[in-house]
Amino acid sequence: MTDAPFDRADIDALLGARHPDPFACLGPHRVGDATVVRTLLPGALRVRAIAAGGGVLGELRQVDPAGCFAGALPDGQERGERPRYRLSIDWPDARQDVEDAYAFGTLLDEDALARFAAGDPRAALACLGARALDMDGVPGVRFAVWAPGASRVSVVGDFNGWDARRHPMRLRRPWGVWELFVPRIGAGERYKFALRARDGAALPLKADPCACRTEAPPRTASIVADLDALERFGWHDDAWLRARASLDLAHAPVSIYEVHPESWLRVAAEGNRSATWDELAQRLIPYAAGMGFSHVELTPIAEYPFGGSWGYQSLSPFAPSARFGPPEGFARFVEHAHAAGLGVIVDWVPAHFPDDPHGLGKFDGTALFEHADPREGWHPDWHTHVFNVGRREVGAFLIASALAWAHRYHVDGIRVDAVASMLYRDYSRAAGEWVPNVYGGRENLESIAFLKHFNDTLHGPAAPPGVATFAEESTAWPGVTAPTAEHGLGFDFKWNMGWMHDTLAYLREDPIHRRHHHDRLTFGLVYAFSERFVLPLSHDEVVHGKGSLAAKMPGDAWQRLANLRAYFGFMWAHPGKKLLFMGGEFAQWGEFAHDATPQWDLLDAPAHRGVQRLVRDLNRLHAAEPALHALDDRPAGFAWLVGDDRNNSVFAFVRRDDAGRMLVAVCNFTPVPRTDYRLGLPAPGRWAEVLNTDGAAYGGTDAGNGGAVQADEIPAHGERWSAALRLPPLATLWLRPA
């Protein structure tokens, strides 16, 4: 081989890990009539170019002692054809034969890049991140990252000694995406990106925003995921997915068991570690299914650095947390859930992200994912960055992650956290601390557009059919569950935070004072059909000094559990889908503690087993009685029978389905038994007492009506017929025409 020039300025820039265009000097280039190969391999002793069959094409001369080598290939290649050669590298302790990363052409399709820049989440899913694949028959990993403000980006990892000089990337202008194919590495490699800001300053090593696998915290590297294995995963849930696609979830029985997977089950014999996905599949899935829940909802499982955030401060929205094992483990978990008849909902946080140095903040030296103005880009309550969802690429990145959960892991629902904080520019901000919209208002127009785009995408052809979306929205924003075509946000369901706050406030009152707060239990029906609601008794209500559900109730231990049982009976009969956080189903006394577990030992006590049995029976009856769910979002499905008996703290209402089937719920929220309480009923004859939360099996006194009552033609409460009931203390009864 002949000597080949290597410009001194290029050498200095490459060695300083600040060259803006490494493909302009590295790899094969035509210089006159020769093909010159230049490479940067710090620490290499000798480099030769070899043919595919192993024959030596020639020596690359060391042109700088820091590791720059150059030489010319022999003639024989057609002009314009990519030269075919490999590099044989002698390291101090090994020899490596590998293709030259800088001999490959551009990787990403221009149309896909343009669509990503325009805000297409499918293009983000196709372009960004790390993907093990073959290029021109050569196995390796294609890396791509969006960093338009960077002056140089390198991929670093175990494969190059974390040396930012070794694998600088190509910038695809004007889209701001950097790409590189690294030959002969594959799934399982650890990596990060080394970036320099526009002024040349080196930034902290950054994890891949689109990584599909990560190290387990506190380690922070990204890992090349085996996406081919995920996409070839042996799913056996075709029947489930077909049924989901045709299910009208709004009019189906939905009862959700909310779980913090890091603490639901711990392995005490192994340092109290969290369970893996496979262990949770063996324990959580049969438990939730046996309890009669229709879905499990997982607090955020996208990788998060700080366990105390419960997952709500994620930095890797595409990657299931490595705390629970590899991504394939989560796929197996969902597969087990579907086989057991359980849907899986994941919490998703597009509102904000933490400021860990390896994360998204000032990713390329600029406010890339966040707003530059702290009045828009910093959340004062959570001390986190606010996603700039009005930037097309950021919106595409986030929605692409939601699509990934739906496609790769077959999740059945996505609950969007902190929607209210997105909708209002002045959320948790005093005057002067927020920026009005273009019309001078407080509404966040960019977030509104983003949420509509999210719902249109998840309900459109880009997503698998039947994936439901849920909004945690705590204000009276109109049209959260209205279609986007009707100027709504397009969610399938909204958490009814007002109902939860009002009813828990009522239940906290001593029964003697409840007559003065009667409206707290009835007010929810004023707006119950304005949206499609979920009634949430979530993790947020049993933490930070608020007390567990059982601890919120007044009275002695028996009265507290009786209050809770009566409340559950009221809730499961009330219009709206149901959600209960773990530990609530057996009335644990302690608050949620993310570093502990639910108080499973309480199930040794009959009273707590009784509450657990009640929740199981409520779920099964709720699923079996169409009157309790078929018209959840329609006024025709509900009517008050007794809504004004504040002196006795008694409530009664009827639920109906569109076939005329009925169920009546009667609640006595005082510890005083009511005998001969005459209740108007919408039909004559025998009514079966299908549920009594005071039943002995649930830990109650077993007071009731012997299993049935008789409705005679005695008018009461606006009905032609009525029955004389015995109302047990602090209890709810369900009656159904026999």
UniProtKB/Swiss-Prot annotation:
Pathway membership: Glycan biosynthesis; glycogen biosynthesis
Reactions catalysed according to its record: Transfers a segment of a (1->4)-alpha-D-glucan chain to a primary hydroxy group in a similar glucan chain
Role description: Catalyzes the formation of the alpha-1,6-glucosidic linkages in glycogen by scission of a 1,4-alpha-linked oligosaccharide from growing alpha-1,4-glucan chains and the subsequent attachment of the oligosaccharide to the alpha-1,6 position.
Superkingdom of the source species: Bacteria
NCBIfam families tied to this protein: branching_enzym, PRK05402.1, PRK12313.1
Organism of derivation: Burkholderia pseudomallei (strain K96243)
Entry-linked InterPro entries: A-amylase/branching_C, Branching_enzy, GlgB, GlgB_N, GlgB_N_E_set_prok, Glyco_hydro_13_cat_dom, Glyco_hydro_13_N, Glyco_hydro_b
Keywords: Carbohydrate metabolism, Glycogen biosynthesis, Glycogen metabolism, Glycosyltransferase, Transferase
Molecular-function GO term, any one: 1,4-alpha-glucan branching enzyme activity
SMART domains (alphabetical): Aamy
Family classification: Belongs to the glycosyl hydrolase 13 family. GlgB subfamily.
Subunit (UniProt): Monomer.
Active-site positions on this chain: 417 (nucleophile), 472 (proton donor)
Pfam families: Alpha-amylase_C (PF02806), CBM_48 (PF02922), GlgB_N (PF22019)
Name of the protein: 1,4-alpha-glucan branching enzyme GlgB
GO biological process: glycogen biosynthetic process
GO cellular component, one term: cytosol
Protein EC: 2.4.1.18
